Amino acid sequence: MLILTDRENCSGHSRNLVSQQLLDTVQHLHCESVLLDFQRPPNPELEAMVAAIVQALPCPVAVTEHYAAGLNCPVFLPPCPLHISMEDYLTPWHNREIWLEAALSQETITVTEGGSVFTPVYSMDSPSGGFYHQKLRCRYHTALYYDRILFTLFDTPETLEEKLEVALRLGVSRAVGLYQELGGFLTGM
């Protein structure tokens, strides 16, 4: 799998030239699939480039949800937020081929009189212990403070494996994760 990002701005480039160069690269490297992991907000120029790439390549090309509308290709979704069940998360995409990012995630939910705030936590250190939440398929800790309640939701290798098994049963065709984060965990996915 060849993964392309839009970390560098893609605007101002010929979509035909980019598509041809990418086709040459895919053929040279014998890539079986391509993932366009584009996170920048869509604009007409970039949408046209993504559509041209999807059309030009002979292998499956997955695109992020920002670029999926109107394209006949797999959609690549970020990890399921921990406060949403996998079933609810995948429902809007039930008629599409889905590639799902696999990652050990953490999230905090801060509950105050004013409402709730959901915040992703980006850390390589994963908490341990805690309680298991059946529907969300994650573990959690709670902390009570004078003015708020803090829930820390987190994945373990076991809960991530359980989520991915559910995702595969719900029609996800591929789980994509970084070896640096997951090691050999995704070998069978």
PLM regions and their residue ranges:
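Chitinase-like catalytic core of GlcNAc-active glycosidases
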Residues: 1-78
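Short, acidic/polar
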Residues: 11-28, 85-86, 155-169
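Conserved, mostly hydrophobic/aromatic
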Residues: 36, 100, 167
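Active-site region of glycoside hydrolase catalytic domains
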Residues: 46-52, 56-61, 88-110
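Substrate-binding cleft/loops of secretory-pathway carbohydrate-active enzymes
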Residues: 63-85, 107-120
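Glycan-binding loop/region signatures in secreted carbohydrate-active enzymes
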Residues: 95-163
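Acidic/aromatic/glycine-rich contiguous surface patches that form carbohydrate-binding/processing clefts
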Residues: 163-189
